[in-house]
Amino acid sequence: SYVLDTALSVNILGTVCPDMVKFDVFRRVNTGGLPLNPQEIRNTLATSEVRNLLKNMSSCDEFMKATLGGVNDVRMGAQELCLRYIVINSYYNWEKHDFNQYYGLTKSMDKMVLLLNTYKKSELESILNEFRVIMLQAHMILQGYSFCKIGQKRINTALFTSWAVVLYNMN
């Protein structure tokens, strides 16, 4: 049979393997079937607490109202948008109007997942609670426009991130 005639190669990534190497290996091996998108790869290396944080952020009522339910999360698109907000908000220095230790979006998002993996449950809950407040404020301000360019219904990730970071820093 086809299965029995197939040769398998197995690589074990042990605990001593650097985390950024794990991201790189996933990206290189990720070629068969339906390829994983970057957020799905990050999800494999996130702790259950971080996965729950992103899932809760992307499914909370405040986020749904602020985005008018316009972000599809079938392949973790909404979770990636929430992580993008955490990254930009963490790396952006509001006083200097500049980024601290920013490595480009993809690498910064990878690094943020690894950093969030080290957070205590109370720190992750704080991120979720702050996010809920920001999304409530965004909904009150933007109402039916929900992070969209005029005349469009699709959520603009840059507008979402910008508004969310500005609202966070206004508090």
Where do the PLM segments sit?
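C-terminal subdomains that position terminal phosphate/3'-OH groups for nucleotidyl transfer/ligation
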Residues: C82-N171
